[in-house]
Each structure stands twice: as structure tokens, then as C-alpha cells.
């Protein structure tokens, strides 16, 4: 699919980023689809094969063995992927001093794999698991070794271990959420990339930034819920738009 944006739009946004001292990016599923992670709600998404209600936090507590079996069979294989040009472009913007932070709704850790340092993970990280009883945190790979079938158990207290990602109905990690809103308040340019801005409370971040005076840039292949609120809209795929934006930004900095 051809991207639908103009050179002038890219130049304007690149100039805005170059002049600003605090630029912040909020990223969603659309940033990782080019790496091979399907949109969970899309035609090829995981929720076509697995009832998403089985990943409600209440269902997990009542049926941890079943949920772990589903997690290992359907979710884990989807995340055996590598960063794509969108991740690398954002990491390079940070290296150039033109991106304060990435706030992500993704759990794949591809931003870190691409080299991003300051990443706020609103929905947790698939790399870890946590004990639901004592709160001890483990590498997911380690927890999987303890699992013969069903849910692994905490070696410290015997509690049920859960993947350290936010399940439906579960509150977001408060430290991450607090930092995300602080960054939104500080931002001079706030970019929402690869997200439809449908999920609360992450979709409040661009509103907070805009109300504090930031310019709002939306980069997405499809329309979003807050297009009407944006200062700039670049309609295209993140992996195609961001490298071009980075090229123009470099040209303005050097």
C-alpha cells in the first residue's frame, strides 16, 4: 500500500522536531506490525483464534493453567521478531538528542532492541513474569523453565506466576503511567505513531500535551479518534514514514 503524505508535510514536521527541545513519541501496535506482529484485533489477529475474554485478569486468577497454555501456544510465537525501520528511526532520533522518550503501548521490547534508552512501557513487557502473591519478578524465559504444564509457580512463595503484561481489566503500572503523563506535560512536540488512540488512558496523553501547548503530530496508516485535534497528520505506515522523517531531520541538524 502506498503511503499518502507529501514532502512538504515531512519537512514541516522535521523542522518542528529540529527546533524543539522536548519531543515525545507515543507508539502503538502499528509500529510493530512490519516486524511481523499482527494487530491482535485485525483479520489475522490472535483474537480471531482465542477468545480475548480469556485474557481478562479475573479469568486468569480463576483459570491460570488454561491461560498459560493459551499464552504459550498463541501469544508467545507472535513475538519472536526483530525491530523494523520505525524502531530504528526513533532510536536514532533519541541518539541525536531529538526525542526525549518513547511511551509505548506495546509489550514486545522492540524499541529497546533497536537502541532506544528511555522507554516507558504502559502495558508491561513480555520479557518478564511476576508472582501474583509476593510480587517477585523473573525473566519470562526463566519462568517458562519451571513450567511443565499450566502456570509456573514462584520458587519463593509458591504463588502463581503471571506474564508481566497488562491483562484486560487490570490497572496500568502506576509508575509508568505517572511518568508518561509527566512527559506529556513537558512535550513541545507530541507524536502519536501507529495507534488509533482508542485505548484509555493512553489516549489522554496527546490531549494533555496539546492542552499544555505542544504540537500534536499523528502518524498512522488509518484515521484515528483524535485526527480532529492534531496539528499535523501524516497518513502512512510508521516503517515508511519515520525513516523519511529522520532523513529530513538529519539534513536540518547537520
From Swiss-Prot:
It catalyses: N(6)-acetyl-L-lysyl-[protein] + NAD(+) + H2O = 2''-O-acetyl-ADP-D-ribose + nicotinamide + L-lysyl-[protein]. Pfam families: SIR2. NAD(+) binds at residues 29, 33, 40-41, 105, 107-108, 123, 195-196, 220. This is NAD-dependent protein deacetylase 1. Keywords: Cytoplasm, Metal-binding, NAD, Transcription, Transcription regulation, Transferase, Zinc. It comes from Pyrobaculum aerophilum (strain ATCC 51768 / DSM 7523 / JCM 9630 / CIP 104966 / NBRC 100827 / IM2). The active site is at residue 123. Its EC number is 2.3.1.286.
Amino acid at each position: 500500500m502506498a503511503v499518502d503524505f507529501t514532502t512538504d508535510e515531512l519537512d514541516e514536521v522535521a523542522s518542528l522536531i529540529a527546533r524543539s527541545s522536548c519531543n515525545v513519541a507515543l507508539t502503538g501496535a502499528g509500529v510493530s506490525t512490519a516486524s511481523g506482529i499482527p494487530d491482535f484485533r485485525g483479520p489475522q489477529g490472535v483474537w480471531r483464534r482465542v477468545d480475548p475474554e480469556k485474557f481478562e485478569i479475573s479469568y486468569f486468577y480463576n483459570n491460570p493453567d488454561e491461560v498459560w497454555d493459551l499464552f504459550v501456544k498463541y501469544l508467545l510465537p507472535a513475538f519472536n521478531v526483530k525491530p523494523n525501520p520505525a524502531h530504528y528511526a526513533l532510536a536514532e532520533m533519541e541518539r541525536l538528542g531529538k526525542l526525549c522518550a518513547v511511551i509505548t503501548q506495546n509489550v514486545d521490547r522492540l524499541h529497546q532492541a533497536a537502541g532506544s534508552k528511555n522507554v516507558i512501557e504502559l502495558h508491561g513487557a513480555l520479557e518478564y513474569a511476576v508472582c501474583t502473591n509476593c510480587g517477585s519478578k523473573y525473566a519470562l524465559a526463566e519462568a517458562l523453565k519451571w513450567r511443565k504444564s499450566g502456570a509456573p509457580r514462584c520458587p519463593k512463595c509458591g504463588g502463581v506466576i503471571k506474564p508481566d503484561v497488562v491483562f484486560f481489566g487490570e490497572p496500568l503500572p502506576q509508575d509508568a503511567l505517572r511518568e508518561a503523563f509527566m512527559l506529556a506535560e513537558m512535550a513541545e512536540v507530541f507524536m502519536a505513531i501507529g495507534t488509533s488512540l482508542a485505548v484509555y488512558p493512553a489516549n489522554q496523553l496527546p490531549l494533555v500535551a496539546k492542552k499544555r501547548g505542544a504540537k500534536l503530530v499523528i502518524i498512522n496508516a488509518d484515521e484515528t479518534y483524535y485526527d480532529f485535534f492534531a496539528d499535523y497528520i501524516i497518513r502512512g505506515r510508521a516503517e515508511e514514514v519515520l525513516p523519511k522523517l529522520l532523513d529530513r531531520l538529519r539534513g536540518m541538524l547537520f
